[in-house]
A protein has these predicted regions:
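A short, structured active-site edge motif that brings together acidic residues
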Residues: 62-74, 100-103, 163
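Short, acidic/polar
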Residues: 16-29, 77-93, 142-152, 220-227
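Active-site mouth loops of central-metabolism enzymes
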Residues: 7-20, 69-80, 108-113, 142, ...
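Active-site groove signature of glycoside hydrolases
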Residues: 89-112
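Acidic (Asp/Glu)-rich catalytic clusters
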Residues: 31, 53-63, 86-95, 128, ...
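Beta/alpha (TIM)-barrel catalytic core signal, keyed to glycine-rich beta->alpha loops juxtaposed to Asp/Glu
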Residues: 45, 105-282, 286-295, 299-302, ...
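Hydrophobic residues in well-ordered beta-strands that form the structural core
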Residues: 38-39, 68, 191
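N-terminal binding-site loop/beta-alpha segment at the start of enzyme catalytic domains
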Residues: 1-64, 123, 129
Length: 355
């Protein structure tokens, strides 16, 4: 189940990958049976792909699975897919990728990935036909409606989906519904952010006490990994390990994996609820009828709830939304440079309280 995500590798003072330390992580994982290695064009400013190619060259190519992702941020009318893809092959020192993903299919990237003039999917399907891509999939941090729309239109070409799933986002970001959507389509799921960028590895004292009462031998991160690993349709659980301590703890969890009991599932659900100082919105949408500003109030409260929990969450996990609404409903999430103009604040204030 365990896969290595090469996005948070140990680094040196200048920010480049500490290849000696990172190489030891790869070797330890490989020698203990981990055979799925995930990278992307942009990880570590492009150095991650190069590092993995170097670190894995000593091992038989058919003894591990290599996954990477398209550089979606570079795609424009002048984009050269041939040059970008061949660069990835060179970086990774391979002539094929076992798994290749459209990187972060979401609301803001959907127009690019589906633009018929850019022919992104057409090129990747050609590479698959040539044997340079074994399995084609997507990763996504997008919202459920977008994922439903994309899979309905393009799902016939997709063989697997990589989703952000953890016991907090199971309800907070509708990970449960996304999981069920992909499962119902008969596609396997690869999990990313099982510890939500590390936030589920550092819990409050009371939550840790409850965990230790049930399983004193387990670390706090182990609970997060066991949650996603217990889901029947999860094929790989990615972990962005950056230290040998994390590697050893994960190997302990997965080499003798135990699915969550009902009691343990209930505990994680309680902990997730306790972590969210949120507005208990059920998305009934009755309030929207009375909103003079025609705001999507449930959606904005969802943004607020997520930002309230993770005010410093990494950019890749942010829910994209118009800056002024984020600033209005989650002050402090963005810098003061994005504060509302006075006229905008007054315009919003004129519509307040009617709902």
């Amino acid at each position: 189940l365990l896969g290595f995500g090469a996005m948070r590798l140990p680094t040196q003072e200048d920010g480049t990958i500490d290849r000696e330390k990172a190489g030891r992580l790869v070797d330890t994982l490989y020698q203990n049976g981990v055979n799925y290695f995930d990278t992307a064009y942009v990880y570590h400013q492009g150095e991650s792909e190069e590092f993995l190619g170097e670190a894995l060259r000593k091992y038989p190519r058919d003894s591990f699975y290599l996954a990477t992702k398209t550089p979606g941020h570079l795609i424009n009318p002048d984009y050269d897919p041939v040059e970008a893809f061949e660069r990835q092959l060179r970086r990774c020192e391979t002539d094929y990728f076992d798994f290749y993903l459209l990187h972060n299919v979401m609301e803001s990237s959907l127009p690019t990935y589906t633009n018929p003039d850019l022919r992104v999917m057409d090129y990747l399907l050609k590479q698959k036909a040539k044997g340079h891509i074994r399995h084609l999939g997507i990763s996504s941090h997008g919202q459920l409606p977008m994922l439903e729309t994309y899979m309905k239109a393009y799902g016939k070409e997709i063989e697997f989906v990589q989703l952000q799933i953890n016991y907090l986002d199971w309800s907070l970001q509708q990970a449960k519904e996304k999981y069920e959507l992909i499962t119902d389509l008969g596609l396997p799921i690869i999990v990313m952010e099982p510890c939500r960028g590390g936030s589920l590895a550092a819990l409050d004292v009371e939550s840790v006490r409850k965990m230790k009462t049930l399983r004193p031998q387990d670390s706090v991160p182990a609970w997060a990994f066991r949650f996603v690993g217990s889901l029947p349709n999860v094929s790989v659980v990615l972990s962005g390990m950056s230290s040998m301590e994390q590697v050893e703890d994960n190997l302990k969890t997965f080499c003798h994996f135990e699915r969550l009991s009902e009691t343990e599932q209930a505990l994680l659900a309680d902990i997730a609820r306790s972590m969210m100082d949120i507005v208990p919105c059920t998305a009934c949408r009755y309030c929207c009828d009375g909103c003079l500003m025609q705001l999507d109030i449930p959606y904005l409260l969802k943004i607020y709830n997520d930002a309230k929990f993770s005010p410093t969450v990494m950019n890749g996990m942010l829910i994209k939304v118009h800056q002024r609404f984020v600033q209005r409903f989650a002050p402090g999430w963005m810098s003061h440079d994005h504060a509302l103009a006075v006229v905008d604040r007054q315009m919003l204030a004129d519509g307040l309280s009617h709902c």
